[in-house]
Structure formats: structure tokens, C-alpha cells
UniProtKB/Swiss-Prot annotation:
The modification Phosphoserine is found at S558, S561. The keyword S-adenosyl-L-methionine does not apply. CDD domains: FANCI (cd11720). Homodimer. Part of a FANCI-FANCD2 heterodimeric complex that binds and scans dsDNA for DNA damage. Interacts with FANCL. Interacts with MTMR15/FAN1. Interacts with POLN. Interacts with UBL5; the interaction promotes FANCI homodimerization. The lineage of its organism: Eukaryota, Metazoa, Chordata, Craniata, Vertebrata. Keywords: Isopeptide bond, Phosphoprotein, Ubl conjugation. The keyword Ubl conjugation applies. This is Fanconi anemia group I protein. It comes from Gallus gallus (Chicken). Monoubiquitinated by FANCL during S phase and upon genotoxic stress. Deubiquitinated by USP1 as cells enter G2/M, or once DNA repair is completed. Monoubiquitination requires the FANCA-FANCB-FANCC-FANCE-FANCF-FANCG-FANCM complex. Ubiquitination is required for binding to chromatin, DNA repair, and normal cell cycle progression. Monoubiquitination is stimulated by DNA-binding.
Length: 1338
């Protein structure tokens, strides 16, 4: 039969063809098409023949065509045909479809919908035909039956799409359907249906099928709905990531059916999807714009949804497109800073923590992106690198005193900018570790910034470089040429940068001979440079090389393991590859350094400070270094035993014209000798063993040094100040050459005395004679110190009370203090009595300890041996703290003999030292605070590290200082020590930071602090301020301080009286600390300051309320509950704050800072009330919410308890200023011209103090304006509680007004409203602050 149809079709006889086809039943027709298709012969020709004999003009023809279409769809989807045959059949059917009438198209389209609903599609090939059918249907103008009514083609198509998107889809056909919809013209609404349906299908598909589906969706988004597509994709992968994380946290998942896919598979799929989206953005820039716009909007509502690891990765991949890079980085940096600020605000307030417990941390998300990028996400890495550097450059470390960047050592500050910088460094370091291809680029950029930003501190970049080198020292061999290029610029860099850079790349020097040789060449050239900085850089470099290239046989004991920062990497394989070469190399460097001993003092100083470390790390150089030092000191040592003084001081200075300079830092030289000799004797000499051949030579210089130091000690004790030409009559003026010379001499002599004190104490072995020598040396030191202080005092120098930087080492200071105050050994008693007999010496010892701790706190390191070794510094701090703590608690200040009241008492110095130590510990050793507190508790020395309860240990220390403070507060007025009380309060504040705010100890401490403030009528302003600041800092971590503020405000009101003198105030007192002396300005300003902080918290909450109010997501119930909780919290806070201000505005505050601060705080309060009212206006617009009763009460409270009182307070302020002006005028009349300046000053002060008044009135009126708006929206009359006042920021003087009007008849009446602002509430531009009034001249 098929052959006959083909033949008839070829003959071109339509009648016969139609007749033949009419004779076939539906089944026969189908079988014929199937047989022909399976044989693969002339299928298209057969179909064409059938269509030719089935004209659309005849009903039978249309019916037959439909039968063929239905059968072909089934045939194609059966999977029995070859792909080529399928394409041929579908192509022909698509061509013929446009000829079908509307009702046939409708029937065919309905068939497809049913097929899809049944899930009968196997390969989706027939869907190409479906798209053509729907397109043709949409163009049909024919009325089509649908249900009981009729629709046109377009409407019918819309109903079909709606039905299709509402029905169940077979997951296997989703991609085909998404592809099909691209070819159909869709309205915006239809497209939204389709996109939402496809997105809902994501969760039902196998993960591997997601990328091609995303690709189809992105192509489909060319029609529109870009935001929906992007939002759906991001949300899907965000949920997958969360589920994956949850499963990692709880690996034994009970619900095995919903176990997520393997991590690596998920990451690879995410990476592919990101690439698809980036490719789409490259083709259509609007998708990128829509992505940024969507994430910005979402970030305002829910940062956790907007900035998840997937979306951040997508943004960073997109940022490679330069047009969007700036927008993306600005958005990410803003988000990071905002996240840091929000966390900072939350951590400071228990009230906020309770209301908003879960807070999003964007930094953790970005670091997770770095971790995820390890799964082959090369497209993300460049964005990560750019973001990392952008964050680091947005912040520069501050320079501390002396120009050295302090951030390296001082730990991370809480500032958001610094946290952002730290995040940038973490991003770069982790990216460096994960992605090998980009390592050279990161290294290149870091080195470039170290060089080009040398004028500003680059410590954060050097720290990053250090960490990079530590993570992969061998990797740098590939970049050695770049490092070598950097060395060429060493001469032009500041010395701090040079030292940091060399320490950072030091591991590379051990594994790369070429880099080491390049550095040596650069350093040898620099050592002869004209520039002082270049020579210092050379010395720093050579010392580093000497420390790190050990000669075989050098000691490797623990005492030689001084850290030089985190960059220390031991490459032992290379360290001793050629010990002979190392020795020659080191001796050559020493030869170069010897030449530096004839250069400026700064260069010599670096050498003297560096030799000790070299000696400890490279002990085989001991002989060479000791010989060098011996020959150097001999130039200044006078061997004749009867000559005084024993050293040639004149050789230490150099004159250039009228200027005098220090040429040889003799005290530093002697200090270096003392430390090197002590180390040599205690270490090398004891380890010599069988090496007798060198022993004689070594004993020679050792004996020389000992004899020399012994002689210098003896003669220094004998020497009088006149021997140094430094008696009291000497000139110490810094403006004259003689004065400068004498100052240099004095500092050198004092330094030499200190060096000898340390030397003799160490070798004395508790000998009475030696300790007498120590005291003799101190006497010499002290005389000079007193003279310098006296001279500095006469010159009104700020350095008058500061001792010169001490030459004692930190280790020795801890030993000396322990001996003076804690050594109870009977054998030491007689010798120590010598030192203990001198109160001045003991005070000096504590003063030096204080100075050392201060230096450590400010610079992160101290002078002298081990000054840069964090471990040794920590141990020394623990020892010093134990001694100072014992000394302070054992001997109260009141019973201490303060030595003719000269200088601070030892107890007070101990207290200052303890405060600095506690601060330093929290800054530099935060991670080691448990060990520190354990070291102070001698009763629990053996506790395991894991068992240390920081809160308990800190509470124990706090109790000691509480007792001392109570003793101070209960002492007689004459015995009260204000300075000591302030220090105790500050120490308690510092230690309180170690308490867990949720602990019982914290609550006990807070209760105690409240009690102290309530029961002690303290009149010392500084102590009062300290106690209240402590109280507030504790209270905010326990609960909101508003009720506390109210009680304090009531006390201030009671103390200062009412603005209405006829009003009697109930004499009740909550806090005795609030009294006539402290109430204003001290307590008042503290209360206002704390109220401002509460207002800032409320403002932050209102912003979150606004964000929650604009969230229209499905999870509206949770948002609604959160909104109600926030609204309740805000209204309660504001309600109590209104009662605080209600008290203060009725208080007769003195003119000045209190009035000014109160007026400004009131303006803020009304501005925040206005923000709250705006929030409710917005809520009324978006929902049918009514005004809650709480808000109504708040408005009523503001209308009854605040606004009227504000106007009364304004009148009061104007009255007190009028009185002060009148008083000044009277004085002017009496003394005429002499007092003109006084009047001008008073007038300026009045103008300054009354400046906030117009702003306050404007804020009140803005509040009332928006209350009117809310009343209209909510149908609740809120204005019934507000009494409009005619009192504004002026008072009309009728007589003056008349005279002015007579004088200025010609003046336009428009100026009059400027003088009468009673109608300000109806200004044309409501958001503009009122203009300043013009002052008329009389």
C-alpha cells in the first residue's frame, strides 16, 4: 500500500490519492508509516504523499493529518528509529504544522501536554514539533473551544502553558522542555511560569544534569526573568552547600535517603554552572548588572541568602570583566565592612545579642570560597587575588612613636578596616597555598607593594610575604630572579622594611645559592654607600646571614633557638651542606662588618645589638666576635688603674662645625660585651670539653674582659661627677654645643653604670661585696638621673619625669625583682639586705620593669637579649607579674615609706606595672592568657592546660584588687590616694574583659560594682568617671543599661535642682557616687554618652526593622515574629530613655558641655523617634497593620513627659545665657573698653551653646509631622497626645520689634516670618533644617 501511495503521489493525481487514503483505517495508516520508517526507506516521501492526499480544506484530511501527527509523535518517542530518520520526520512535520487549522493545532498541543504529564517522552525529540505547534497556535485568530467557553489561539496557548507548568514533569525531559520554550514566543507572565517551574525541578534532577539545564535557562533568560533565574540558581546551590555542611558536622546521618552527593562532585558541578553564567554575562551584560542589583537588594534583607559561597564565587568570576569589576569589589568590600561593624556592635551589647542572636559573618564565607576553589575553580582565583589586595590596600597600619609600624606585634585591633585587611591577607595566603599557577603572580604583587609603598608602613604586606614563604619555601626557587631584583632596591628602603623583607625571604637564602650570592653583592655595595639608611640595611642583612648560616659544630641548644618571627624555617638538608664554605663565608662577612665599626653611631648601634644574637645562633664565631669587641673597647679603655674615669668619653663624640654628635655608643658597646661574655661563659666555655688547642686563646680574651670590667666597675664607683665634668653646675641646655655634649656624656655614663650593675649582680653570686658595688654604681647613676630631671624640669621639658631608656635586660629585671622582693633564702639575706636598704634602688628596679613592659606594649619587643623572642618575653612577664602582685598586696601604699615623698611610691609603681602587663597580655598574648593566669596562681601550678578555667582564675585576681579598692574607698580623707584608686579601677576594667559575661563570677562582679557606686560618696572626679565607665561596660554585657541610666538621671536631678526654682524635688538617692561635686559635668556627660550609645543601638535595630519590613519572601511568619520582637525591644528602650531625658531636661544644668550634649542627645532622640514612626508608616502601606498599643503609649509619653519639658528647658538655657550676657555688659559699663574682649568671649560662648536649639526644634517638628502622617494612615489620632507649643527657638520682644519696624519701613514684610517660626510645622520643604536667623544690627 505504501508503494501505491508513493506512486500516486509521484503521478500527481490528488483525487486517486485521496481515494486510496480514505480506504485506510487509522490503524492501517499507522502501521504503514511505522513499517516504512523502520525499513528506513522513503519515509519523508510517504508522509508528503499522505499530506498531499489530506488537504486541510477537508475535514477528513485534517483528521488524517492529526492521526499521522499523533502516530509520528509516538513513533519518534519510542526510540526505535535512527536519529537521522527522527530528525527527517520531525522536520517535515514542523513544516506542515503551520497549515493545520486552529482547532487541530489545539488538539495536537493538548496531546503533547498529556504526553508530558504522563511522562511518556523518552528522548524529547518530538518537543521540537511541540514548539512549532504552540507558535502556530498563538498566531491563530480562530475561536477555540476550551471547557465551556471559547478562547483565541494566544489565550489557548497561555492556558496550555499554565496547565503544563502546574503538572508533574518527568525529570528526564526537563532539559528538553527548557530548550523547547526558547523557540516559543512567551509573554512576561508565561515566561515567569516556565522559569519558576524549571527551577522547582532542580531538586528532582540528578546533580550532573543541572549544568546543561542552567545553560538552557540562561538562554531562555534572554527573553526576560533574569532576576528569577539567577535567584533560583543561587538559592538552590546555597541550600545544597548548607546541607553538605550539616552532613559534615553530623557525619552519621540517620536520614540516608536524603544524603547529599559527594563533595567533589558538588564542587565540580558548581564550578561548571559558574562558568555557564559567566559565559552568559560575557554575551549579555544585562545579566551581570541584574546579578549585582539582585545581590545588593538581597544583602539588605538577608546577607546570609545573598552572599553565600556560591554567589561570592560567581561574583569573583564575573569580576574578571573589567566593566563590572569596580562595582563588584565595592559591593563586596562594603558587605565585609558592614558585617564586621555589625558583629562589633553585637559583641558590645547583650540587649542586641538577645534580640538578634544569629548574625552572618561574610569573612567566613569568603574563606570558604577559597577552600572550594581548590576543586579546579581557576576562574575564581584571579578575582580572589584582586579582592585580597584590594582589601589590604584599603587599610594602612598606623605608625607608632619612632616611625615603626606597630601592627605587626600588637595583634589585631577590633576596627572593621583592620579586620578587612586581615581577611585580605588570609585570602591571599590561602589562595597561594591552594593554586600553584597563580603563586608567582601573588608573590610579584606583594613584592611590588613592599617596594612601591615603602614611604608608608608595609608591615601587613611583609607579614603576608613571611607567611607565603613559610607555606612553600622551595616554591620560591622558581621566583628567585624576582626576589633578586627586589634586593637591588634594598638601599632605598626604610630600615624596618629591609629587616622585615630579609627575615621574610631568609628560608630562600638557605636553599638558593644564587639568591644568597646576589644578596651579598648588594649588601657589600650598600655598606660603602653615602646614604646612612643603605649602610644600616647592609648591616641588618649581614647580621641576618650570620645568624642563619651555621658553621659545623655550632650549638643547637634550646637557648640558641631565638625566633625572628614566623619566617623561621629550618631547611636542615641545606644548612650544613658545606660547613667549610659556611665558615669562610661568615668570616668574610665579619670582616665587612668590622669596617662598620668606624662608621656613624647608628650603624655601630645595630652591630652591637645584633652581635649577641649572632653569637647564640652561630657559636663557632664566638672567638672572632669577642676579639672584635675587645679591640673596639680598647680604643676607649684607660688601662692605668689610678686614672678616673676609666673610659675616654671624649672619644665618643664628634664635632661638625657647631654641632656635636655621638660617634661611639660606648654604653651599647659595653652592654654587648657584657651579654656576649655572660653567654660565652655559661655556654661555650662549659661545652669546650676536649678542644684544648683553642682554649688558651679563648681564656685570654675572657680574662681580658673580666679584668677590664672589674677595673671599670671599681673606678666608676670611685669617680665623682666632676671627673666626667657633669656636676650640678654643668650646662645641659639642648640649645648649646656644651649642653648637647654634657647630655651625651650623662646618658653614656648612666648606661655604663646600668651595664655594670647587671654584670656585677650576675657574677656576684649573692656576694655582699659585689652587691655593695652594685649599690655604688647605682649611686653614680642616680646622681646623674636626678640632675637631668632637675635640669629638664627647669627647661619645662616633657621628659622631665621620664627616665632614660634603661640598658638592663628584661631577663635581668625579672631576676632582680624576684631577688629584691621574693628571695627568702637565708644564705642570701645578708647580701640582699645591702640592696634592700636603698628604697631608691628598689624604686628604680620597679621603674625599669615598668619601662620595659611599656616598651613591649608599644613596640611588641624590648631592647636587649631575647627582646624579640616572644616565648622568653612571656616567661619574663609572668615572673615580673608574680613579684609585683606580691609586693603590692603585701605592703599597702598607706604604710609604705615613700622616701621623703619624692617620686611615686613603690606600690604605686607596682600597680602601674601590673596594669600595663595585663594590657600587654591581652594585646600580644591573648592565646596564652590561660597559662599566664595559671602562672600567677602558685596553688595550681600542675593543672593541665585544658583544665584551666580563665574566668575562675581572672575572678581570683579581681578579688585581690577589689579588696584594695574597698580599702582605698573606706580610708580617711587624708589617706585617700586618687592615683592609686584610678589605677585599681582601670585594672579591674582590664581584668573584667577576661570574665565570661554569662558566668556567675561576672554577675557577682557587676553586683559588687553597683554596690560600690551606690554606697560610696566619692568626690574625686577621675575616680568617679572610672567607676561609672566600669559599671556601664559591665552592665551592657549583662542587660540594657536604660533603667540604670534612669536612676542616675533622677540622682542628677535631685543633686542639681530643678529649672523651676519653686519646685521641690524628692530627696532620694540611688547612687551615692552622684553628688554635688560629681553630678555635673562628670556623671551627666557619662550618662548622656551611654544614652547616645543606646540610641545608636536602637537606630541599628530600626534599620533592621525596615529591612525585615521590605522582605516579601515566603517565610513571612518567621520575619513577622522577629519584627514584633524587635519592635517591642525598640519601644521599651525608647520609653525608658524618654524617662531619662525627662529627668535631665528638668535639671538645672550649668551652662556649657552638659547643656550642649543634652540638646544634641535630644535631637538624636527625636530623629530616632521619627525613624520609628516612618517604619510604622511603611508597615501601614504594605499591610493592613494597625498601630500597636505599645507605640501609642510611647507617643503619649513623648507628648506628656518630653516635648513640653524640652521647650521649658530651651527657655531655661536662654535665660541663663541672657544672665551671663547681662553680667558681662555690666562689667563692660564699669570698666569700659577693658572688658570688651570679655563680652565678645561671652557672646561667642552663648552663640556656640545655643547653636543646637534650632536643630532640636526642627527634630521635634519633623517628629510631629510624621505623627500626623501615621495618624492619617492608621486612622488613630496620635496627635491628641502632643501639645503644640508657641515657644520655639526665640522670644518676641515687642518694644524692639516696634523700633525695628519704624527704622525699616521700606523693608519687605517677607523677612518677618524669619522671626516668628510658630508655624514651622508647615514649612514647604520638610526635610530641610531651618535656616539660621539673621541678627539685626541696632
Amino acid at each position: 500500500m505504501a508503494q501505491r501511495i508513493l506512486q500516486l503521489a509521484a503521478e500527481g493525481s490528488p483525487e486517486r490519492l485521496q481515494e486510496a487514503l480514505q480506504g485506510l483505517t487509522e490503524g492501517e495508516l499507522g502501521d504503514m508509516v511505522t513499517r516504512q520508517a523502520l525499513r528506513g526507506r522513503e519515509t519523508a516521501a510517504l508522509l508528503k504523499g499522505i499530506f498531499k492526499g489530506s488537504p486541510c480544506s477537508q475535514q477528513s484530511g485534517v483528521l488524517r493529518r492529526l492521526q499521522v501527527y499523533k502516530h509520528c509523535v509516538s513513533l519518534v518517542e519510542s526510540g526505535d528509529l535512527h536519529v537521522g530518520k527522527v530528525s527527517e520526520i520531525i522536520g517535515l512535520l514542523m513544516l506542515e504544522a503551520r497549515q493545520l487549522p486552529g482547532h487541530a493545532l489545539a488538539e495536537l498541543a493538548t496531546l503533547f501536554v498529556e504526553v508530558i504529564k504522563r511522562g511518556s517522552l523518552s528522548n524529547g525529540k518530538s518537543l521540537e514539533l511541540f514548539s512549532t505547534v504552540l507558535t502556530a497556535l498563538s498566531n491563530s485568530k480562530e475561536s477555540l473551544a476550551y471547557g465551556k467557553g471559547e478562547l483565541n489561539g494566544e489565550e489557548f496557548k497561555k492556558q496550555l502553558i499554565n496547565t503544563l507548568c502546574s503538572s508533574k514533569w518527568d525529570p528526564q525531559c526537563v532539559i528538553h522542555l527548557a530548550n523547547m520554550f526558547r523557540d516559543i514566543p512567551l509573554s512576561g507572565e508565561e515566561l515567569q511560569f516556565v522559569v519558576e517551574k524549571v527551577l522547582r525541578m532542580f531538586s528532582k534532577l540528578d546533580l550532573q544534569e543541572i549544568p546543561p539545564l542552567v545553560y538552557q535557562l540562561l538562554l531562555l533568560s534572554a527573553k526576560g526573568s533574569k532576576k528569577t533565574v539567577l535567584e533560583g540558581i543561587i538559592s538552590f546551590f546555597n541550600q545544597l552547600d548548607k546541607r553538605q555542611k550539616e552532613e559534615q558536622r553530623v557525619p552519621q546521618s540517620a536520614d540516608l535517603e536524603v544524603a547529599t552527593v559527594p563533595l567533589d562532585q558538588l564542587r565540580h558541578v558548581e564550578g561548571t554552572v559558574i562558568l555557564h553564567i559567566v559565559s552568559a554575562i560575557n554575551l549579555d551584560q544585562d545579566i551581570g548588572e541584574e546579578l549585582i542589583k539582585h545581590l545588593k537588594t538581597e544583602q539588605q534583607k538577608d546577607p546570609g541568602k545573598a552572599l553565600c559561597p556560591f554567589s561570592v564565587s560567581l561574583l569573583l568570576s564575573t569580576a574578571v570583566k573589567h566593566r563590572l569589576q569596580e562595582q563588584i569589589f565595592d559591593f563586596l568590600k562594603t558587605s565585609i565592612t558592614r558585617s564586621c561593624k555589625d558583629l562589633q556592635i553585637l559583641q558590645a551589647s547583650k540587649f542586641l545579642q538577645d534580640l538578634c542572636p544569629q548574625q552572618y559573618d561574610v569573612t567566613a564565607v569568603i574563606l570558604e570560597v577559597v577552600k572550594n576553589s581548590a576543586f579546579g575553580w581557576d576562574h575564581v582565583t584571579q578575582g580572589l587575588v584582586d579582592l585580597g589586595f584590594s582589601l589590604m590596600e584599603s587599610y594602612e597600619p598606623k605608625k607608632s612613636f619612632g616611625g615603626k609600624a606597630a601592627e605587626t606585634n600588637l595583634g589585631l585591633s577590633k576596627m572593621p578596616a583592620q579586620q578587612a585587611c586581615k581577611l585580605g591577607a588570609s585570602i591571599l595566603l590561602e589562595t597561594f597555598k591552594v593554586h600553584e599557577p597563580i603563586r608567582s603572580d601573588i608573590l610579584e604583587q606583594v613584592l611590588n607593594r613592599v617596594l612601591t609603598k615603602a614611604a608608608s608602613p608595609v608591615s601587613h604586606f611583609i607579614d603576608l610575604l613571611s607567611n607565603i614563604v613559610v607555606s612553600a619555601p622551595l616554591v620560591l626557587q622558581n621566583s628567585s630572579s624576582r626576589v633578586t631584583e627586589t634586593f637591588d632596591n634594598l638601599s632605598f628602603l626604610p630600615i624596618d622594611t629591609v629587616q622585615g623583607l630579609l627575615r621574610a625571604v631568609q628560608p630562600l637564602l638557605k636553599v638558593s645559592m644564587s639568591v644568597r650570592d646576589s644578596l651579598i653583592l648588594v649588601l657589600q655595595k650598600a655598606i660603602f654607600s653615602r646614604q646612612l639608611d643603605a649602610r644600616k640595611a647592609a648591616v641588618a642583612g649581614f647580621l641576618l646571614l650570620l645568624r642563619n648560616f651555621k658553621i659545623l659544630g655550632s650549638l643547637t641548644s634550646s637557648q640558641c633557638s631565638q625566633a625572628i618571627g614566623a619566617t623561621q624555617v629550618q631547611a636542615d638538608v641545606h644548612a650544613c651542606y658545606n660547613s667549610a664554605a659556611n665558615e669562610a663565608f661568615c668570616l668574610e662577612i665579619l670582616g665587612s662588618l668590622r669596617r662598620c665599626l668606624s662608621q656613624q653611631a647608628d650603624v655601630r648601634l645595630m652591630l652591637y645589638e645584633g652581635f649577641y644574637d649572632v653569637l647564640r645562633r652561630n657559636s663557632q664565631l664566638a672567638s672572632s666576635i669577642m676579639e672584635t669587641l675587645l679591640s673596639q673597647i680598647k680604643q676607649y679603655y684607660l688601662p692605668q688603674q689610678d686614672l678616673l674615669p676609666p673610659l675616654k668619653l671624649e672619644g665618643c663624640i664628634m664635632a661638625q662645625g657647631d654641632q656635636i654628635f655621638l660617634q661611639e655608643p660606648l654604653a651599647h658597646l659595653l652592654c654587648c660585651i657584657q651579654h656576649c661574655l655572660a653567654w660565652y661563659k655559661s655556654t661555650v666555655h662549659l661545652c669546650k670539653g676536649a678542644e684544648d688547642e683553642e682554649e688558651e686563646e679563648d681564656v685570654g680574651f675572657e680574662q681580658n674582659f673580666e679584668e677590664m670590667l672589674e677595673s671599670v666597675t671599681r673606678r666608676m664607683i670611685k669617680s665623682e661627677l666632676e671627673d666626667f665634668e657633669l656636676d650640678k653646675s654643668a650646662d645641659f641646655s639642648p640649645s648649646s654645643g656644651v649642653g648637647v655634649k654634657n647630655n651625651i656624656y650623662a646618658i653614656q655614663v648612666m648606661g655604663i653604670c646600668e651595664v655594670l650593675i647587671e654584670y656585677n649582680f650576675k657574677i656576684g653570686n649573692f656576694s655582699k661585696n659585689k652587691f655593695e658595688d652594685v649599690l655604688g654604681l647605682f649611686t653614680c647613676y642616680n646622681k646623674l638621673s636626678e640632675i637631668l630631671k632637675e635640669k629638664a624640669g627647669k627647661n619645662k621639658s616633657t621628659l622631665g619625669n621620664r627616665i632614660a631608656r634603661s640598658f638592663l635586660s628584661m631577663g635581668f629585671v625579672s631576676t632582680l625583682l624576684t631577688a629584691l622582693f621574693r628571695d627568702n633564702a637565708q644564705s642570701h639575706e645578708e647580701s640582699l639586705a645591702v640592696l634592700r636598704s636603698s628604697t631608691e634602688f628598689m624604686r628604680y628596679a620597679v621603674s625599669v620593669a615598668l619601662q620595659k613592659v611599656q616598651q613591649l606594649e608599644e613596640m611588641g619587643q624590648t631592647d636587649g637579649p631575647d627582646g624579640q623572642n616572644p616565648e622568653k618575653m612571656f616567661q619574663n612577664l609572668c615572673k615580673i607579674t608574680r613579684v609585683l602582685l606580691w609586693r603590692y598586696t603585701s605592703i599597702p601604699t598607706a604604710v609604705e615609706e615613700s622616701g621623703k615623698k619624692k617620686g611615686k611610691s613603690i606600690s604605686l609603681l607596682c600597680l602601674e606595672g601590673l596594669l600595663r602587663i595585663f594590657n600587654t597580655m591581652q594585646q600580644l598574648y591573648a592565646a596564652r592568657i590561660p597559662q599566664f593566669l595559671q602562672a600567677l596562681d602558685i596553688t595550681d601550678g600542675d593543672a593541665e592546660e585544658a583544665d584551666i578555667n580563665v574566668t575562675e582564675k581572672a575572678a581570683f585576681q579581681i578579688r585581690q584588687f577589689q579588696r584594695s579598692l574597698v580599702n582605698q574607698l573606706s580610708s580617711a580623707e587624708d589617706d585617700f590616694n586618687s592615683k592609686e584608686t584610678q589605677l585599681l579601677i582601670t585594672i579591674l576594667s582590664t581584668l573584667s574583659k577576661l570574665l565570661d559575661p554569662g558566668s556567675q563570677q561576672f554577675l557577682q562582679f557587676l553586683t559588687w560594682t553597683v554596690k560600690i557606686c551606690k554606697e560610696n560618696a566619692l568626690e574625686d572626679l577621675s575616680c568617679c568617671k572610672g567607676l561609672l565607665t566600669l559599671l556601664f561596660s559591665l552592665h551592657v554585657l549583662y542587660k540594657s543599661p536604660v533603667s540604670l541610666l534612669r536612676e542616675l538621671a533622677q540622682d542628677i536631678h535631685a543633686c542639681l535642682g530643678d529649672i523651676d526654682q519653686d519646685v521641690e524635688i524628692e530627696s532620694r538617692s540611688h547612687f551615692a557616687i552622684v553628688n554635688v561635686k560629681t553630678a555635673a559635668p562628670t556623671v551627666c556627660l557619662l550618662v548622656l554618652g551611654q544614652a547616645d550609645k543606646v540610641l545608636e543601638e536602637v537606630d541599628w535595630l530600626i534599620k533592621r526593622l525596615t529591612i525585615l519590613g521590605s522582605d516579601t519572601s515566603e517565610d513571612s511568619t518567621q520575619a513577622s515574629n522577629q519584627t514584633q520582637a524587635l519592635e517591642k525591644g525598640v519601644i521599651l528602650q525608647l520609653g525608658t530613655l524618654l524617662t531619662v531625658f525627662h529627668e535631665l531636661v528638668q535639671t538645672a544644668l550649668p551652662a556649657g558641655s552638659c547643656v550642649d550634649s543634652l540638646l544634641r542627645s535630644l535631637s538624636k532622640t527625636y530623629a530616632i523617634l521619627t525613624s520609628l514612626i516612618k517604619h510604622y508608616i511603611q508597615a501601614c502601606r504594605s499591610t493592613s497593620n494597625t498601630v500597636p498599643g505599645r507605640l501609642e503609649k510611647l507617643v503619649k509619653l513623648s507628648g506628656s513627659h518630653l516635648t513640653p519639658q524640652c521647650y521649658s528647658f530651651i527657655t531655661y538655657v536662654q535665660n541663663i545665657h541672657s544672665e551671663s550676657l547681662s553680667f558681662a555688659e555690666e562689667k563692660k559699663k564699669k570698666k569700659k573698653e577693658d572688658e570688651t574682649a570679655v563680652v565678645s568671649t561671652v557672646m561667642a560662648k552663648v552663640l556656640r551653646d545655643t547653636k543646637p536649639i534650632p536643630n532640636l526644634i526642627f527634630a521635634i517638628e519633623q517628629y510631629e509631622k510624621f505623627l500626623i502622617h501615621l495618624s492619617k494612615k492608621s486612622k488613630v489620632n496620635l496627635m491628641q497626645y502632643m501639645k503644640l507649643s508657641t515657644s520655639r527657638d526665640f522670644r518676641i520682644n515687642a518694644s524692639m520689634l516696634d523700633s525695628v519696624l519704624q527704622e525699616q519701613n521700606t523693608e519687605d514684610a517677607e523677612n518677618e516670618p524669619d522671626n516668628n517660626q510658630s508655624g514651622t510645622a508647615e514649612q514647604p520643604d520638610e526635610n530641610q533644617e531651618p535656616q539660621k536667623k539673621r541678627r539685626r544690627k541696632k
